[in-house]
């Protein structure tokens, strides 16, 4: 409850309250009536208040502090629910500020309450940290300690909710609250809003103090008290509760105030779903029966004597007039078949700036061509507010819906997404709330469309966004979509421009209506740089390996695949271009992928011509269209026999010590490569010990560079780590990558690439990298990769220092070596001592005979391995009659010792 109101706000309150405003939505057709009944809500207290007001309470309000356990609350909760009402608890942490809470000082208490409320099971509306836009509570932003900020409040509120969710207390609904006025430095209505994922309801507290207070309070109408806060909260797509309100008797007509208050709520505050009176004689007499006139007005306003059934606890939106039906994702993918992208249109900065604007006749032409799906990329950034509440421009949302309706009306499976909204990756944690609000509005606008409309969360995330953040984003947005679109199919993908390499690494949410997506533009030099030709056996083998890789992921995870983009620039070799479209589309459709070819409507551009459909002449490139729809038209392909799997080698005993690969004391044996304007050079300079290799590199936006050392012996299976000394020599502290390349499966170029990122600084550092710390390279894999997903240490081709970004710099490296165990990891075994009694005699000979004759039982596999090591006397990795002969000769003293 608000304790005081500054006089400086009073004049502003009166003036602003006189202004009209337009409310949003219409949620209060069944306004819920609630109250703090003036004391803790026992059965008798609830009954007495209901008799007084002449109506059952829908909501019963309770105040507790953070020294109160749920065991104390439970009898009151039982009384509330036995009455058929909802319990709303205002939870006041008098002992803590928001910094304490976010830092975990109250975690034990919060956890205990979460567990107890979960066990209770009934729905509870919980209102923690209320009226924080004031200056009278220890958790408030304006409090005199100045320790609370918007940021610490948000973190504290979210921390509380996260603990409840972690303990499974999903029966608790979260109520965010503001005071009717902002009081104190740094306060605002929405600056401390925790975000839609953490709030189920918003609420406002406000009082008409009349002329009762010494600080100069004056009589205010309901609108003068509540209009400003309501306008702020109405911008959030959450139902609103008037959680505390009341009027004084002194200074005006309380009965009239009550009547006008409820009239205002029902006519102008359409997002308000509940009004909860504060019934107590406290700072002044707030009770509904402070006078007979007030009580009569209150009973009339709430409809005393009317029948009001038990309220539905959780607000739900108006059900759609024609809800989309649930469709199995595999069935949807089969329905989608071959489709197209409406590229460079709604995902341009502004429609028409990259290509011809969308026209309805396009969809007639797509239909005639045979397409079954249309992907409509959409960029929302330039049409969305950059500050809270991040509202999408209505005209643009209407335009997107118009284009979607054109597509759906022709029977197309239609996909809309977030496309080129690259701002999310620049500061994921700072921008995710805006992205969530965008998707909340998309989901709300399109919730009534047919099941043939699919949502794709994000097109081609890349750059600074991590795989973990992409997983988090997919999870967050999916939860938002599911609130209004419970069965709509949603498409998810991985990073690095929706690469197949990252698709197989994404964390798949537990949801039955998902499709995975990937894009394919390989080889990039051909598809985007129009260099060389395409169509060799090896070219096609590479596609088959990649698509089989994706299909295997699909089968393992029982999730269908949408091949969302593929294309070649028009300036590429024409015959090769047609072959590429033909083979790629065949390979995808044969594996059950749905497809959408990339078509951006651009003709004649040297760096952007990927059009198949001419939007002006309404004609298609029929040769490519034929390649897309007719299998095997151009290339002749005979799949290679499946390669013989590499034999599984037995575990090896780790080497002990170190092996120098290059200390740079002789001839420099490193090569280099670069392209797209990037450059690299190497030379011998002074190193950490003796000589080292200096690498000087210049990066560019699309450039690449690297230095490479080809290995004479590529079997590292007995080694545990690789180590080198490195430092930056020009003051730069740029990230670079150290890469291990396997041997190619076809003998051409490299095999699978494995990388580890490092950031050298100006002092020498020894970097030791366990081989288990290398990760499969995501931005590129060569055609010769085996796609095993395992670093094959017995099949290493080369090592590289290479680019990680477009920066320039210089570093020196020295003493590259392999690291083994620090000591012999196997216990000492005496060869020939098969019963391990530290003697070699006839007993051991008898045991060896029995083992060879398979009549010796050794127990566990570990015991057998130990026996075999002692019995393998000629060290040929097998135990046979040759070992028996050696042992006989030793016992007969024909040889003086067993060879080791």
Curated annotation (Swiss-Prot):
It comes from the Bacteria. Residues 827-900 form the Dockerin domain. It catalyses: Endohydrolysis of (1->4)-beta-D-glucosidic linkages in cellulose, lichenin and cereal beta-D-glucans. InterPro entries: CBM11 (IPR005087), Dockerin_1_rpt (IPR002105), Dockerin_dom (IPR016134), Dockerin_dom_sf (IPR036439), Galactose-bd-like_sf (IPR008979), GH26_dom (IPR022790), Glyco_hydro_5 (IPR001547), Glyco_hydro_5_CS (IPR018087). GO terms for biological process: cellulose catabolic process. The active site is at residues 131, 244, 460, 565. Residues 45-298 form the GH26 domain. Gene3D superfamilies: Dockerin domain, Galactose-binding lectin, Glycosidases. In the N-terminal section; belongs to the glycosyl hydrolase 5 (cellulase A) family. In the C-terminal section; belongs to the glycosyl hydrolase 26 family. This is Endoglucanase H. It comes from Acetivibrio thermocellus (strain ATCC 27405 / DSM 1237 / JCM 9322 / NBRC 103400 / NCIMB 10682 / NRRL B-4536 / VPI 7372) (Clostridium thermocellum). The gene is celH.
């Amino acid at each position: 409850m608000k304790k005081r109101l500054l006089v400086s706000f009073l004049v502003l309150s009166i003036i602003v309250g006189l202004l009209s405003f337009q409310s949003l939505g219409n949620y209060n057709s069944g306004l819920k009536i609630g109250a703090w009944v003036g004391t803790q809500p026992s059965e008798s207290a609830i009954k007495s208040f209901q008799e007084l007001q002449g109506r059952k309470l829908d909501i019963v309000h309770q105040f507790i502090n953070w020294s109160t356990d749920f065991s104390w609350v439970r009898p009151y909760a039982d009384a509330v629910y036995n009455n058929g009402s909802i319990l709303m608890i205002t939870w006041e942490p008098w002992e803590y500020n928001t910094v304490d809470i976010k830092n975990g000082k109250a975690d034990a208490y919060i956890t205990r309450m979460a567990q107890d409320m979960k066990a209770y099971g009934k729905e509870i509306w919980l209102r923690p940290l209320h009226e924080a836009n004031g200056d009278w509570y220890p958790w408030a932003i304006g409090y005199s300690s100045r320790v609370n900020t918007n940021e610490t409040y948000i973190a504290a509120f979210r921390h509380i909710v996260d603990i409840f969710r972690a303990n499974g207390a999903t029966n608790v609904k979260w109520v965010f609250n503001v005071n009717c006025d902002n009081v104190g430095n740094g306060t605002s209505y929405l600056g401390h809003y925790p975000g839609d994922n953490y709030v189920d309801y918003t609420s406002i507290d406000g009082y008409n103090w009349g002329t009762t207070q010494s600080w100069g309070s004056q009589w205010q109408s309901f609108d003068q008290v509540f209009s400003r806060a309501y306008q702020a909260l109405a911008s959030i797509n959450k139902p609103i509760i008037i959680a505390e309100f009341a009027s004084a008797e002194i200074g005006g007509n309380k009965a009239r105030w009550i009547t006008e208050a409820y009239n205002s709520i029902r006519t102008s505050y359409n997002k308000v779903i509940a009004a909860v009176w504060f019934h107590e004689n406290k700072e002044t007499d707030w009770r509904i029966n402070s006078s007979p006139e007030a009580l009569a007005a209150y009973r009339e306003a709430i409809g005393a004597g009317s029948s009001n059934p038990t309220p539905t606890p959780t607000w739900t939106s108006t059900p759609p007039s024609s809800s989309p039906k649930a469709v199995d994702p595999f069935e949807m993918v089969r329905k989608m078949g071959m489709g197209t992208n409406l590229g460079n249109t709604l995902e341009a900065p502004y429609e028409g700036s990259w290509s011809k604007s969308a026209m309805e006749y396009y969809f007639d032409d797509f239909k005639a061509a045979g397409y079954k799906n249309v992907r409509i990329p959409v960029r929302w950034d330039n049409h969305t507010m950059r500050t809270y509440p991040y509202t999408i421009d209505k005209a643009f949302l209407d335009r997107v819906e118009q284009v979607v309706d054109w597509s759906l009306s022709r029977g197309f499976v239609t996909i809309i997404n977030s496309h080129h909204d690259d701002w999310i990756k620049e500061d994921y944690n700072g921008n995710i709330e805006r992205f969530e609000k965008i998707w909340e509005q998309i989901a709300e606008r399109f919730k009534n469309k047919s099941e043939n409309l699919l949502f794709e969360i994000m097109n081609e995330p890349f750059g600074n966004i991590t795989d973990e953040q992409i997983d988090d984003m997919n999870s967050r947005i999916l939860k938002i979509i599911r609130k209004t679109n419970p069965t709509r199919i949603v498409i998810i993908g991985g990073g690095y421009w929706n690469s197949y390499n990252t698709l197989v690494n994404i964390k798949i949410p537990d949801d039955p209506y998902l499709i995975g997506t990937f894009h394919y533009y390989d080889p990039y030099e051909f598809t985007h740089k129009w260099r060389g030709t395409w169509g060799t056996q090896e070219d096609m083998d590479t596609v088959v390996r990649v698509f089989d890789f994706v299909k295997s992921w699909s089968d393992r995870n029982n999730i269908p695949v949408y091949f969302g983009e593929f294309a070649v620039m028009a300036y590429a070799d024409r015959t090769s271009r047609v072959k590429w479209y033909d083979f790629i589309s065949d390979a995808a459709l044969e594996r059950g992928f749905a497809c959408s070819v990339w078509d951006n409507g651009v003709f004649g551009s040297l760096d952007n011509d990927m059009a198949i459909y001419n939007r002006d002449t309404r004609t298609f490139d029929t040769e490519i269209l034929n390649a897309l729809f007719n299998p095997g038209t151009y290339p002749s392909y005979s799949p290679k026999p499946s390669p013989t799997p590499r034999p599984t080698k037995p575990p090896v005993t780790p080497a002990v010590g170190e092996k120098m690969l290059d200390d740079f004391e002789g001839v420099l044996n490193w090569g280099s490569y670069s392209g797209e304007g990037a450059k690299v050079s190497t030379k011998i300079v002074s190193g950490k010990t003796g000589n080292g290799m200096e690498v000087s590199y210049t990066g560019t936006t699309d450039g690449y560079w690297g230095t490479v050392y080809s290995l004479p012996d590529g079997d590292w299976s007995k080694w545990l780590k690789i180590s080198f000394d490195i430092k930056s020599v020009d003051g730069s502290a740029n990230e670079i990558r150290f890469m291990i390349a396997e041997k190619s499966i076809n003998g051409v170029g490299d095999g699978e690439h494995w990388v580890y990122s490092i950031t050298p600084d100006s002092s020498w550092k020894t970097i030791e990298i366990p081989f288990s710390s290398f990760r499969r390279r995501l931005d590129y894999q060569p055609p010769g990769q085996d796609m095993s997903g395992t670093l094959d240490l017995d099949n290493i081709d080369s090592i590289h220092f290479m680019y990680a970004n477009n920066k320039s710099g210089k570093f020196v490296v020295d003493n590259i070596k392999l690291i083994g165990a620090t000591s012999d990891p196997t216990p000492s075994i005496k060869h020939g001592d098969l019963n391990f009694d530290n003697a070699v005699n006839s007993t051991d000979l008898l045991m060896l005979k029995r083992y060879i004759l398979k009549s010796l039982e050794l127990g566990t596999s570990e015991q057998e391995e130990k026996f075999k090591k002692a019995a393998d006397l000629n060290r040929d990795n097998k135990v046979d009659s040759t070992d028996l002969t050696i042992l006989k000769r030793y016992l007969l003293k024909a040889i003086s010792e067993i060879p080791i």
